[in-house]
Amino acid sequence: MSKSLKALFAACALVAAGTAIADSQVVNLYSARHYSTDEELYNGFTKATGIKINRVDGDDAGIIARLKAEGQASPADVIMLVDAARLYRGEVDGLFQPIHSKLLEDAIPSNLRAQPTADGISWFGLSTRARVIVYNKAKVQPADVQNYESLADPKFKGQLCIRSGSHPYNLSLFGTVVEHMGEQKAEGWIQGMKANLARPPKGGDTDQIKAVASGECTIGVTNSYYLARMMRSGKPEDQAVVGKIGVVFPNQSSWGTHLNIAGGAVARHAKNKDNAVKFLEYLASPAAQNYFANGNNEWPAAKGVELDNPALKEMTGGKPFKSETIPITAVGKNMTKVQQMLDRAGFQ
């Protein structure tokens, strides 16, 4: 048994110790996380607690639609989504059950979870992804792309690659920029980025990284874990791409780099609530948090977790980076405004 799995089993035992064993040794999970590395996390939880995980996979939008359709008949106990705006939407639509958990509240920073109510907290971030700028080292100086505002600088006209503006990763970034800049300046920024596009938005984040390396564009935007995945790849073609690009964690001298989250919630009509809370608490444990980092190259959401991931360490020069501290709920609150701005700008 690996050292990391032993640590995970120990974490599960600690989570289980303070709670009586549920009548039903099962937890039903609806998950938008499609990462094979998560299987060891799930298996570790079951081995340590005896609680079996029944999992249904889908994307964020599909899971929310399914919960609405199932209503009170839904078997779901835990919901895991990979975007803050969708978590916010699920809360607003009454699909989650607020909970009180000292373990979760102590572990997860207040800006990475739902706003508290008298009934508890509806959802918690469990891992984070930094939205970073990549640049072609032969064509761009890092000093010229130190903040998100530079993406709209006219000197980069025809040089920016980014996936669809309406993709959740970008909607999340744009939603927090509205919070930082205000609506008028944020809309001007979106229009400036549209003017700087090297091509119509297409592909995923890995495609933007490759396009920057090839010279099709000189700057791009990606989630950090896509770059870390390529950095850890043994494929020569991936290493060739990595060798041509640099990475910037934007806005270190101002509001900090934007983080989106993958997070979890207890379903509104959970039949196995105690098991659901145990599972979320397990995922917030230091061992599980480090496993998120090693398995899918994500940053831990919990406080004070030491990383083992060499790519994440290399990406930041082995130093912590400044991330924004505004409540991640701002992403959801600003979504309608952002989509209207994108429509006015003709940003696909």
Which residues does each predicted region cover?
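N-terminal signal peptide c-region/cleavage motif recognized by signal peptidases
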Residues: A17-T19
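Ligand-binding pocket segment of bilobal, Venus flytrap-like solute-binding proteins
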Residues: G165, Y169-S172, T176-P250
